[in-house]
Amino acid sequence: MVDSNDDQPERHALLHNDIQTSNNSRPSLVQKKYLPTPQDTRKSRASYTGSAMINPTSKQSRTGSGAQRTSRTAQKLKLLPEEPFQRDSERLTDLKNQEVYSQVNRIKDKPARRDAEKLGKAHRHLLPRSTAYCTASSYNMKELVRWLKDCRKLHHTHPKLFDECLYTPFIYNDWRGDKRFEDEDVIRLDDEGGEIIVSDKHPDLFIFEYGVVVMWGFTEREEKAFLNDIEKFEKEKLAEEDIQVEEFNYYVTKSYQPRIYNDFITLRDGSNYMVKLSISHAIAQSVKISLFEELVDNTIEDTQDIPQEIAYSGKVSMSKEDIMKSIGELFILRININLHGSVLDSPEIMWSEPQLEPIYQATRGYLEINQRVSLLNQRLEVISDLLQMLKEQLGHSHEEYLEFIVILLVGVEVLISVINIVVDMLASQH
């Protein structure tokens, strides 16, 4: 993931762990919605359901640098209403799709604002990482569960399956020792900022059936080691240049409400894996969509010269077979994007744990998943129209060729008939 510049406008989404809002908070034109964070229930509903991913058959090469979302560049802010269940339709209409580019001044909590002003590239090495990798079409979840259970003593694993997501704590004791009982590392970025806990003593894994793994609290070395460990469970492994990555940093503080700001995730409780689960679902969907964006970019590169070729020469060098293959690949991409429920729909866990839904939706909004999917479909539709036009043109050319053959055969038959008549006339004269 490309780190955003400190002087760029920064994107900000709020995740709140308390349904109630302060009575003395003043209403303002720009408001924020504090979303409920679930209690640390520690319960799970496990099942082995899920669907396999459909992938393009042709090998693609990676041409981009990751997710195509504006929060990586311009980092726009979509403000949310202050009340979590507000029913004032007029206020919702006024705030809908409102975008702000000076988010730091919009943060009313002084400690949060001071920390937001300080956080930047220079602090990423101080904070624990939250990284998502898309490495394959899918994972063999049953074998993964069995392997993680076998690692219980070595890595302190305790796997739980939430539909298409497999959760477990995971610790590399050989590299970091047993930190589970050490004191928290607390720092302050600013004298007026909040107390920030930067300890990574709760490393958590979220493995998604559709080929994505999200790691919380891992070092880069540990991330690479784990990716090597799960290679044997990958189905249709991606080439190294095709692997997609989303990088965030996170920290824990009780000084202000949780949020996602400039790719920094603020949590109130670092040990609450249910909150991490809801955030991880959105991040996993985002990194999977990044793969689709790369595939679409590659398809555009392959077809961008066709209109110019038609304009200059009036002909197309592609054969009908190549065009049909390209059309088939486009349909596969559309199926992956629109019909694969794990990538687009709210996860099943949100039905059984509805208190997680606001956190998931806020993260999903930050990552601009709906907008990116809509843009992907528009681009695919343009390419599809082009290829369909080429297919029809080749069909017309084939029809013209058949007509030419028929005319030629008729001409030959007429010529033969004329020759026969001439021969008969000459024979009758003799």
From Swiss-Prot:
Pfam families: DUF155. GO terms for biological process: meiotic cell cycle; sporulation resulting in formation of a cellular spore. Keywords: Cytoplasm, Meiosis, Sporulation. GO terms for cellular component: cytoplasm; fungal-type vacuole membrane; mitochondrion. It is found in: Cytoplasm. Its main location: cytoplasm. Residues 1-73 are annotated as: Disordered. Residues 18-28, 46-73 have a biased composition (Polar residues). InterPro entries: DUF155, RMD1/Sad1-interacting. Required for sporulation where it is believed to have a role in meiotic nuclear division. Belongs to the RMD1/sif2 family. Present with 952 molecules/cell in log phase SD medium. This is Sporulation protein RMD1. It comes from Saccharomyces cerevisiae (strain ATCC 204508 / S288c) (Baker's yeast).
